[in-house]
Amino acid sequence: MRAVYAILAGLLATGSASPLEARQSGNPFVGRSLFVNPKYSESLERTRQAFLSRGDQTNAAKVQYVQNKVGTFVWISNIFLLRDIDDAIRNARAAQSRGEKPIVGLVLYNLPDRDCSAGHSSGELSLDQNGLNRYRTEYVQPFAQKLKAASDLQFAVILEPDAIGNMVTGTTAFCRNARGPQQDGIAYAIQQLQASNIHLYLDVANGGWLGWADNLKPTTILQKAGSNARIRGYSSNVSNYNPYSTNNPPPYTAGSPSADESRYATSLGNALRERGLPTNFIIDQGRVALDGARKEWGEWCNVSPAGFGQPFTTNTNNPNVDAILWVKPGGESDGTCGMSGAPQAGAWFDAYAQMLTTNAHPEIRADGGGGGSPAPGPSSTAVAPSPSATPGGNCAARWAQCGGQGWTGPTCCAQGTCQASNQWYSQCL
C-alpha cells in the first residue's frame, strides 16, 4: 500500500491539522438520483430497435428501462466536448423543474499524454506541445466556470481516470516523463473546482490494478493541490469490469486484499484513514464481467461475456462507499481489442450493448421503467436540430450532436454514434 499514498498526499497538502476534511458534510448522493443522460439514451435506441427487430420484447424492455431510469456520468474527454456540460445542465434543470433531485455526474478526462501505458484512449493534448498550459486554460478553467455558474445544481466530478494507476505502475519513459506534469494538472483541477455544489472524486484505478499491498500508497497529488483543497473521496473501477462484491473470487485474485471493489474500498480506505486522508468511494458497476470471462485481472478491453451491473444506489453495505453507479456508458467501445468486431475507443459498439443487456443485473427490469420519460425514438434528440437541415436517408437520430472540423455540407451524420474524433466526426457540422 505504499505507492498510492505518496501520490495522493502530494496532491492535497498537509498544511493544517486536518487539511482533507470534506467541504461538504455527508454523502452527496443520498436523497438524490443520478442524472439520466439523454444522449446515452439516444445511443441505446439502436440497441432497443435491434432487439425489437428480432421480436425480443424482454431485452428491448430492459434497454428501455436503462434509457428511462439509469443515470450515467457524462464524459468530457476533450475541449470540444465542454459543450456537453451545457447540455447536461439544461437537461438536469428540466428534471429539477419536474420535482426530481438529480446530481450530475461528470468525468474530467483530458490530461496531456493521458493513457500513457495502453494508448487506446490517448487524448488531444501533448506535453511537448504546450499541453499542460492548454489543459489549465482551455479545459479546466471553463469546466470549473460552468459548474460554479450552475450553483442551483449538484455535481459529482471524477478526476482523470487511470492517471494515478499509470503514475504508480507505468514503467515506460513516456509515463515517467508525464508523471510530474500530470500531478500538477490534477492538482490544478482540484484547486479550480472548489465549490459547495461540486463533489470531487479522485480516480484510484481499481482493485486489480492498485489493490495489491505494495501499490496502495497515495499522497503526492494531494499535497500539490494546496492546504485549502478538498475532495470528497475517490472513484474506482471506472471503465473496468470488477464486481462490487463476490463470494467466489476468481483464482487470479489470490493473495490480494482487494478481490472485489468493496474490499478494495475497505483496504485502501482503512490505510488512507490512518494518514488523515478522505475515505469515501464511488464505484463503477456499469459493466461487470461474468464468472469465467477473464483468465487474468489485466484483461480490461471489451471483456466478454459481461453484463450491465448494479444501477445507482447508496445502499452499499460498506461505510466507505458513497454510491454504486454507472460511470462508463455501457456500449461505448474500449478500443479495437477484446470482443471481435470492436471499433475504436468511444465509438458505439451495438453488439456489445446487446450482450450487456442480455446479461444485465436483475434490477434492470423488463418492464421498460414505466413512469419515466418515454424512450427516445429515431426522431427524438436531446440536441435541437439546425432549422436549415433535415435528417434523412441513412442519417441517425444523433445527427446534430457533433461538431466536425471543416465540414460545410448538410448537418447529418451517417449511422453510428457521432463523437469527437471517431469515424463519423468529420461528417457533422
UniProtKB/Swiss-Prot annotation:
Sample GO molecular function, one term: cellulose binding
Name of the top EC class for this enzyme: hydrolase
EC number annotated for this UniProt entry: 3.2.1.-
Glycosylation sites per record: 237
Region of interest: Disordered: 240-261, 362-390
Signal peptide as annotated in the record: 1-17
Xref: Gene3D superfamilies: 1, 4-beta cellobiohydrolase (3.20.20.40)
SUPFAM superfamilies the record matches: Cellulose-binding domain (SSF57180), Glycosyl hydrolases family 6, cellulases (SSF51989)
Family statement drawn from the similarity comment of this UniProt entry: Belongs to the glycosyl hydrolase 6 (cellulase B) family.
Protein name, as recorded: Probable exoglucanase GH6D
Organism field: Podospora anserina (strain S / ATCC MYA-4624 / DSM 980 / FGSC 10383)
